[in-house]
């Protein structure tokens, strides 16, 4: 049904307050998922399967804590469960999904306005790389890519979730490609995150790792800028970036490069990147002050999710 939490999907956040059973497998109930923990799954019995005893009842009380390796404990539970009809519950999720689809997703991937936007870029890449492993860095591109990419296979996304590890994406993409050499690996990274581990372009060059890098350049630390816009009256503090010349950096590491900023360039540039046998850096200059929704304001219950 999608992702839960601050920038998760509409349906799981809205239905969090209505569920009567919530099964959490190996999770830490961090604030990016729970929002206000006192209102998380407030009407549900919570079953928490966890290998680390320190995580049990740390932030959210578990009615049924199950301590152990989930490879052993989960089958012990599932073998005792009989199949039930949840069609009515699933239909309620579909109603919420359709709201998000119509109000958020379809407008975000539509090719309109003077500037490219992150949602349409993710959608366009997904159409041509339908068997790719998706890797994200941290920030707005992480939210767009994780929610809008069209996954057709398991084990196809590597992202650091709510840990906020800027710079994670580039080295993670290198590892993903080495671990799965027969699959394309597409990295979505912002201009701020790329500069955290920019030196790993040298690793790509030295080791000949053909990672496809989609650089979403909006000239901001976009996620922090969005918070400053929405909650601090547009008082932008240390979020606007003066970037280096990414073309010179790519060329200096012998990595093919292209920069685009128009809708009519997008599909052809992605095709060029896909056909390239080596690594490729595609810089996409996107709308500078685009916001990513849905969003749960900090400290609020997850069902208080905003669509705008």
Walk through the language-model features, giving the residues of each.
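Glycine-rich, acidic loop regions that bind phosphate or pyrophosphate groups
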Residues: 1-93
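Thiamine diphosphate
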Residues: 7, 13-18, 57-59, 65-67, ...
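Structural signal for hydrophobic packing residues in well-ordered secondary-structure cores
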Residues: 20, 26, 74-85, 97, ...
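Structural beta-sheet core signal
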Residues: 24, 48, 134-136, 187-188, ...
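Anionic group-transfer/hydrolysis microenvironments
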Residues: 26-28, 50-52, 139, 193, ...
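Conserved acidic/glycine
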Residues: 86, 99-103, 110-114, 298, ...
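Short coil/turn segments at secondary-structure boundaries
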Residues: 88-93, 137-138, 283-284
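Active-site diphosphate/adenylate-binding microenvironment
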Residues: 98-176, 182
